[in-house]
């Protein structure tokens, strides 16, 4: 049981260090960029499916 407590303590220290440093702001920016790229790809595939989907069936 003490082993798991120490493991979670170390994980919480690492998460706290990353959360309270500037790393979190940089990763949030990257996550926003990846989100918008995923939305654009989704919209492109949606338009393609609607345009070509009728021709397939």
From Swiss-Prot:
It is a multi-pass membrane protein. The keyword Cell membrane applies. One of its GO terms (cellular component) is plasma membrane. The chain crosses the membrane at residues 4-24, 33-53. Keywords: Cell membrane, Membrane, Plasmid, Transmembrane, Transmembrane helix. Coiled coil: none annotated. It is found in: Cell membrane. It holds the Pfam family DUF1328. The keyword Transmembrane helix applies. Belongs to the UPF0391 family. This is UPF0391 membrane protein RB0084. It comes from Rhizobium meliloti (strain 1021).
